[in-house]
Amino acid sequence: MKNVNNRELGRQGERIAREYLSEKCGYTIIGSNYYASHKEIDIIALDGEYIVFVEVKCRTKTERPSHRPGRAVGFAKRKNIIEAANRFIFENCDLDFVAGKRSRVDVVEVVVPPMDHRFNDNSGELKLSACSINHIRNAFYSDGTLR
């Protein structure tokens, strides 16, 4: 089995989150890794009347349980997500999939199991079924404070 570094784990965590959101939650993924200046949004999706901006946090199960991945989304990061989301809406307000939609920010925590259960065969690709997902809908207010 292949070892992965933090960047690769994060990339695969985002892939797992996209898979989860589309297959399990019915979201339509319209973009990923959107940048506005130095601010990034991991996933942009549609969920009914909402355009959803998603922050993905991926951690290994071996880390302390009290350190939930979502806790890594601090106030400054939340403000950056909001600024990037506002920029995306401003740049795309004339598109049908944005016009008239309400917006919200979700956080998806992906907790990865021990190495021996992570991957499909020897492909190095993380399996959705092997991960624990915690989906926090509407995770914080537009001023960055937690709900």
Language-model features and meaning:
Residues N92-R147:
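Domain-level recognition of nuclease-like catalytic cores that cleave nucleotide substrates
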